[in-house]
């Protein structure tokens, strides 16, 4: 019973600590996200959504080309 209470208190503390330390960066993160989206609108070739990848069963040279990221001569 005591161990359960200690675990619950520890989880609550760590959750609260995560929120407390994340607050100063949240506005900055939204600003960076907006700037990135604006840059992608001006330069569509830089968008992550335009990157092509191969489906499973397609021959490949590296894992970067595969949608799954796994390549051993064939995408998995």
Curated annotation (Swiss-Prot):
Which residues does the propeptide include?
23-52
Q: In which tissues is it expressed?
A: Expressed by the venom duct.
- Cellular localisation: Secreted
**Pfam families attached to this UniProt entry:** Conotoxin
Sorted alphabetically, the Gene Ontology cellular component annotations on this record are: extracellular region; host cell presynaptic membrane
Looking at the record's lineage, which domain of life comes first? Eukaryota
Q: Which InterPro entries does the entry mention?
A: Conotoxin, Conotoxin_omega-typ_CS
Disulfide topology: 53-67, 60-71, 66-75
Signal peptide region: 1-22
Record carries keyword Secreted:
yes
The molecular function terms in GO held by this entry are: calcium channel regulator activity; ion channel inhibitor activity; toxin activity
Q: Which UniProt keywords apply?
A: Calcium channel impairing toxin, Cleavage on pair of basic residues, Disulfide bond, Ion channel impairing toxin, Knottin, Neurotoxin, Presynaptic neurotoxin, Secreted, Signal, Toxin, Voltage-gated calcium channel impairing toxin
Q: Does the keyword Disulfide bond apply?
A: yes
PROSITE patterns named among the record's database cross-references: OMEGA_CONOTOXIN
Family label:
Belongs to the conotoxin O1 superfamily.
Written domain comment of the UniProt record: The presence of a 'disulfide through disulfide knot' structurally defines this protein as a knottin. The cysteine framework is VI/VII (C-C-CC-C-C).
**According to its UniProt entry, what is the function of this protein?**
Omega-conotoxins act at presynaptic membranes, they bind and block voltage-gated calcium channels (Cav).
What protein am I looking at?
A: Omega-conotoxin-like TxO3
């Amino acid at each position: 019973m005591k161990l359960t209470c200690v675990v619950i208190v520890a989880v609550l503390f760590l959750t609260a600590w995560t929120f407390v330390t994340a607050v100063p960066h949240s506005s900055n993160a939204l600003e960076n996200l907006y700037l990135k989206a604006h840059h992608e609108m001006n330069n569509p070739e830089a968008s992550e959504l335009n990157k092509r990848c191969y489906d499973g069963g397609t021959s490949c040279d590296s894992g970067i080309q595969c949608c799954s990221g796994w390549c051993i001569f064939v995408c998995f």
